[in-house]
Amino acid sequence: MSALNDGIKNDASKIWLFDYDLTLYGEEERFVLNSLDHRIAEFVQKTVGGTFESATEIRKDYLHRFGTTLSGLMAMNGTAPDDFFDFIHEPEYLVYPKVSTEKFALLKSLTGHRFVFTNGRGDWSRAGMARMEIAPAIEDVFDLKLMDWEGKPHASAYEKIEKWLVARGVLNKDAKDKSQIVLLEDSLRNLEPAHERGWTTILVNPNVQAPDWVDFHIPHLLNLREKLISNP
């Protein structure tokens, strides 16, 4: 681990970027993501035919090969992104995370700016944050649509959010040191490009071993409290 692993300064220069699924809610609520994955597999089945089981395997294959299932559907099946999301985000088929006053308090305690950086369309994360009652602690959502449907871990996703942050006036466009950008993610694959750009990386995952290039490793979002160093 890097020397940064001793603690992270909680100061006004920070730009906190949170992945949504399995980051803003944790492994203990995986049933939330499972409900979405079920709908995605149903969409794949509707698109390519076959059994639900074979559609599930195609979903996983596209996710692995293309970064997101949607990217695979677009490349291999000509799927229109909004058709995909309109289908999988029908609320009556989905489960959402529970209210968490602890998460809200933690997020509000973070100085600087706070955004969600997600490979989903923004309505999914916004609905989940509303259910958790943490939405007022997040300034905005940078979603897959704003990435022109090419999400993490593609380099373009990170380039686009940096430009978006510059346009919002929270990142200096000439900044050489980008360690003020802090990405919290459950996926090592999605953290690696952030590390290569000089961002501070926080792996939020209880089930994987963090490699040396990861700056911080916590099992759950709430464990971030233990890593924060506030200005005196």
Place the predicted regions along the sequence by residue:
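N-terminal helical cap/lid subdomain that shapes the substrate entry/recognition surface
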Residues: A3-E102, D123
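Catalytic-core regions built around general acid/base machinery
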Residues: E102-T111
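Asp-based, Mg2+/Mn2+-dependent phosphohydrolase catalytic module
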Residues: M1-K14, F115, R121-P232
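Residue-level marker of alpha-helix boundaries and capping positions
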Residues: F31, K60-D61, V116, Q180-V182
